[in-house]
Amino acid sequence: MDIKQSSEKQGRPHHLSDSRTVLKRNFILIPAYILLQSIVPIIVVFGSLGITAMITQQAPPQWLYHFSLSLSFVIAQGLILVIFYKMHQSEINDVVKQQWIVAKNKIIKIVIVAIVVYLLLLIIRVIGTSLPNHLSYHLTQYEQRTLGLFKSPYVLLVTFISMVFLRPMVEQIIYRYLIIHELGKVWNRQFVIGLSIFIETIVHVYDMASIFEILPYIVIASAATILYIKSRDNLIVAYIFQVILQCILFIEILSKYTNF
């Protein structure tokens, strides 16, 4: 008996919405996330720097800027997850348990995929540095922005929480659950899969300096999407993959680019 049949017999859905009806309320998460990612950093960063300057009568330390910026991302991402939880409060615990039953049996496969993807990223990086000057890049623009959150030891824990745990979950909800699972009820499945990968990629490379910066994010988005689809739209499987990969990337950045 497969997991979905077992879930139905127990009255527990394998997904948050197994019906063919699109839950339109879910899509408020997209503008809410964009809004929170824009407003919360302004409030937290300028608020903390302003209060510090007012109390000390001195310019705030540089680490405080990076800490408050990273903290603002955690707050924004956390708020989105709280909103999503409240929207599905009556069913989400059972769904997570059922999806975890499937996901824990695929851990080895997920780890292997994450390692293969990381090796592909290394190969792409080598190719990127060997291209002609107008096409080459060492770090993508997104990676350069991310490095700012590693400039102080005070920031690392908050950055780790955001980069490894919270952001990947928000991304699974938006790119996999909303776009593929929900929109897939009314639009062509192959189209929404391609749309999901395209949007996830563009969000990371909107300010790219080289067209080849797009390659790493296509690989990551494609791998997460394939795992999601192959596991019958299991968010936990895709999430675990992203957590493992982001943890590897976090350690790499920590070892290469930090010098406290």
Where are these regions (language model features)?
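Membrane-associated alpha-helix detector
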Residues: 33, 138-139, 144, 175-184
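Juxtamembrane helix-loop-helix connectors linking adjacent transmembrane helices
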Residues: 54-64, 92-167
